[in-house]
């Protein structure tokens, strides 16, 4: 299930994005400041390039590129 990012509280969205950009394996030695990485993800969400996916089984949200999400989830 996709969660519209504009339906989340601003603080909740920020925490979700911060969790994503600070995970092991996502920085690849990137020294870009956290605020910059968060802003990049927000722009991707605003442009529709990224989406928030909710997994009912694990009760967790994940960020994903829209192109990587099954087409049937986008309908």
From Swiss-Prot:
Domain of life: Bacteria
Annotated disulfide bonds: none
Record Pfam families: UPF0270
Entry's family note: Belongs to the UPF0270 family.
Stated name of the protein: UPF0270 protein PST_1436
């Amino acid at each position: 299930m996709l969660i519209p990012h504009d339906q989340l509280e601003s603080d909740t969205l920020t925490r979700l994005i911060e969790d994503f950009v600070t995970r092991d394996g996502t920085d690849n030695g990137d020294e870009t400041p956290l605020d910059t990485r968060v802003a990049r993800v927000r722009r991707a969400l605003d442009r529709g390039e990224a989406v928030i996916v909710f997994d009912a089984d694990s009760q967790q949200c994940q960020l994903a590129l829209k192109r990587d999400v099954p087409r049937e989830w986008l309908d």
